[in-house]
Amino acid sequence: MTLQKDKVIKWVRFTPPQVLAIGFFLTIIIGAVLLMLPISTTKPLSWIDALFTAASATTVTGLAVVDTGTQFTVFGQTVIMGLIQIGGLGFMTFAVLIVMILGKKIGLKERMLVQEALNQPTIGGVIGLVKVLFLFSISIELIAALILSIRLVPQYGWSSGLFASLFHAISAFNNAGFSLWPDNLMSYVGDPTVNLVITFLFITGGIGFTVLFDVMKNRRFKTFSLHTKLMLTGTLMLNAIAMLTVFILEYSNPGTLGHLHIVDKLWASYFQAVTPRTAGFNSLDFGSMREGTIVFTLLLMFIGAGSASTASGIKLTTFIVILTSVIAYLRGKKETVIFRRSIKYPIIIKALAVSVTSLFIVFLGIFALTITEQAPFLQIVFETFSAFGTVGLTMGLTPELTTAGKCIIIVIMFIGRIGPLTFVFSFAKTEQSNIRYPDGEVFTG
């Protein structure tokens, strides 16, 4: 299979990383053109704002330069909803589904692309995974929309309430963070139905499809794969730490939790603890948060959620591998062991490569925005981390960005969605060498 795969790669004009990058780019362009149509907007929309909105939706980020609820018509909002769905599940998923509907055979080249898009270790079973993934996603979005409609239909009426329910269900499951309301979800800060449904959706979408299918298949923690164990325990621990941190730091802040009842404080702390790694919805004003909370949120946005999910960031498992490897080194151990499993050296190197490349991209983004924007440094840093993690949280800078600033954020969102290594591999040529050079000594630390 390896030999056959190498032959196919040589035959294909573009490598899988290049196809993924080009596919996302073309989706963004088509989306921008659709959003500029008169039928899509209530008032004229500039090309850069259309491009930014399409990029934000396709990369499932959620940063917005215009108000989604008032700037766009139902048609325009439906286009955004479609871009979110394509961006969340991956355009290759929809391409394969279309080929299957047309009754055509899916070749090895297409299977390789799906493998790359879904970040799967092997090529076997990827088409079956696409079918299950699509049906599972649509089912959970429709069920969630029905539950949300119980709360929203009485408030907005049948047509608007049902549409808002579907829009927010799709936006949440795909970790987009787009909302039809100017204050996002701040009006529902203490609403149990909205809080539970929305967080369930973006945690489910962000934990990764591989983990979900593993849990549904095996059901017992002992039989889960190492990846699933890391994701479940890491998610629970990080969410608990984040909730406690937000609750303590913002408890007396009059701009966030200070004016809320204790129950609403807990709901808001929970919501804002889990949203930075995935979705980008907010029930509190991030522009009013204390600097300590903002800095902690930067870490959460950079970590992100799970591999093979609708979220971005360096991924939680990457963070865990690096952290445990450092701890193992400091304790004088030669191996990194997690849950009685040794982590292979190439995995550790890949985790380091992802992290260092990501930090470099974020640094370049911050550097560029400090040149183009006249804004407080912390706002620039926050917006850059949010764009790279495709989170969508903002301290209020995004609507005020210059044209150059919007272009920079678009590029960062794009790289964050396809992944830093995929982006680099789409340009770089990988060469294997059989030459073994002698070891050299380098002083570090």
Curated annotation (Swiss-Prot):
GO molecular function, one term: potassium:chloride symporter activity
GO biological process: potassium ion transmembrane transport
InterPro entries reported in the protein's UniProt record: Cat_transpt, TrkH
Keyword Cell membrane: yes
Membrane disposition: Multi-pass membrane protein
Gene Ontology CC entries for this record: plasma membrane
Subcellular location(s) of the protein: Cell membrane
Gene knockout outcome: Impaired potassium uptake.
Keywords from the named record: Cell membrane, Ion transport, Membrane, Potassium, Potassium transport, Transmembrane, Transmembrane helix, Transport
Membrane-spanning parts: 19-39, 46-66, 79-99, 127-147, 161-181, 196-216, 230-250, 286-306, 313-333, 351-371, 377-397, 408-428
Function: Integral membrane subunit of the KtrAB potassium uptake transporter. The 2 major potassium transporter complexes KtrAB and KtrCD confer resistance to both suddenly imposed and prolonged osmotic stress.
NCBIfam families: 2a38 (TIGR00933)
PANTHER family named among the record's database cross-references: KTR SYSTEM POTASSIUM UPTAKE PROTEIN B, TRK SYSTEM POTASSIUM UPTAKE PROTEIN TRKG-RELATED
Family (UniProt): Belongs to the TrkH potassium transport family. Ktr (TC 2.A.38.4) subfamily.
Quaternary structure, from the entry: Homodimer. Part of the KtrAB complex formed by an octameric catalytic ring of KtrA and a membrane associated dimer of KtrB forming a potassium channel.
Protein name: Ktr system potassium uptake protein B
Source organism per UniProt: Bacillus subtilis (strain 168)
